[in-house]
Amino acid sequence: MVAGAGLNDRGVVEFVVERAPAAIARLQALGVPFATEGDALHLTREGGHSHRRIVHVADATGWAVQEALLNAARAHPNITLVPDQVAIDLATSRHEERYSGAGHVWGVYAVDRTTGLVDLHTARATVLATGGAGRTYLFSTAPKGATGDGIAMAWRAGCRVSNMEFMQFHPTCLYDLQVKNFLITEAVRGEGGRLVNPTTGKNFMPYYDPRLELAPRDVVARAIDAEIKRYGLDYVHLDISHMPADFVREHFPNIHEKLLGLGIDMTRSPIPVVPAQHYTCGGIVVDRDGRTDLPGLYAAGECTQSGLHGANRLASNSLLECFVFGEAAAAHIARRWDDLPPPPPVRPWDESRVADSDEEVVIKQNWTEIRRFMWNYVGIVRTTKRLERAANRIAMMTEEVADYYGHFRVTPDLIELRNLLQTADLIVRSALHRKESRGLHYTLDHPDMLADAVDTILVPSHF
């Protein structure tokens, strides 16, 4: 509640916390090998937490959970995985052969990466679990597909979107021009790592926050950003070399091995780090059952704004949110299955008036440009003038990409660029709407936090 700066929904926070033990137990049953200490789970501590309460798999928890879930899905007789599909847009009542006006979501149009053809996947219920919009920024720890696809599709279909101004920047991403997006886990600071200015040789966090390296991510990221700008640095140092070497190797085996391959021995030398975009705290408005504004459409995870995180996500709560709301959405669909109407006839994708692209340079140019100006103008520290500059560029590029989209066949790169622009627009509009600094949104023009904590809610005007 403290990290969320007053915007958390207390009921949702309690809802998630109460269901955490069951979610962890289910993951164990699916084969996630959480670290143990004796007969109990080993608990670690990360930024913003007052106690050790985080279960983990060494320093590769996300990978271990992903592998377990994928293996379980592949083995389940009622689950059919359809790989290499890139979603274009939701199929709604507007796409019915006989328009009903019900506003229902009936599935999704997706292009097959292998064939280039557009498929229509229909269903009684559709769940968006598409992740965040990290690739909107030049530097991000997010995977390549994190282009805000679910958020953009839901917005275009008619869903409200909330709190998109709250983009979390992880304080410690490895600074290496050849190896991008390698995250140095928060647990390194939790287990004693110190942030040091390489010019002065001093640990600088005491000058910024009494919680030192364990302050919330927004505080630590702004502190690092301030040191970099004040001293003209490319990076700062994260140093855990004062801890026993065996302790470091045991707690961070994957990071240790990766860094050794890059010529850095973290048991002897500091790690060069910089902040990078890490998590999208805003998204599609959902309730505790994962329901969106549209009948038949559910969402879970980073693409949503559930009320759990507020203005800043507490470390390691993202996976928990996925499990709890994924279960909640599935349970709600199962309970209501007999009441969910089957999909009516839906029109296939129409490519009759488009041609193959002969201007791929447009996509590459805009892709690079948008990520660069979002980093420079809509980053860790903002101003109204920078946000307005970003808004002007987004408007110009949106018109250009819309013209391109209307004349050429869809490709995965074009789909992602279109969604990047849409989510960038939502981020900037939300940031301009908030006339205060709160949590992850820090603006020099409004540095104080207002007394009333109010969500930013954007409502589609095209409906």
PLM region spans:
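An anion/pyrophosphate-binding glycine-rich loop and adjacent beta-alpha core
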Residues: 153, 159-271, 332-339
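General beta-strand structural signal in soluble alpha/beta enzymes
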Residues: 34-37, 81-84, 120-122, 128-129, ...
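FAD-site-proximal beta/loop scaffold in flavoenzymes
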Residues: 89-115, 120, 264-308
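Glycine-rich active-site loop/strand segments that organize a redox cofactor
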Residues: 1-16
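Conserved redox-cofactor binding core of oxidoreductases
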Residues: 28-117, 122-124, 129, 173-176
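Alpha-helix capping and helix-loop boundary segments enriched in small/acidic/polar residues
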Residues: 11, 57-60, 114, 118, ...
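Glycine- and aromatic-enriched mobile tails/lids
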Residues: 26, 32-52, 196-213, 224-227, ...
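Glycine-rich loop(s) and the adjacent beta-strand/alpha-helix scaffold that form part
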Residues: 125-179, 215, 229-230, 317-328
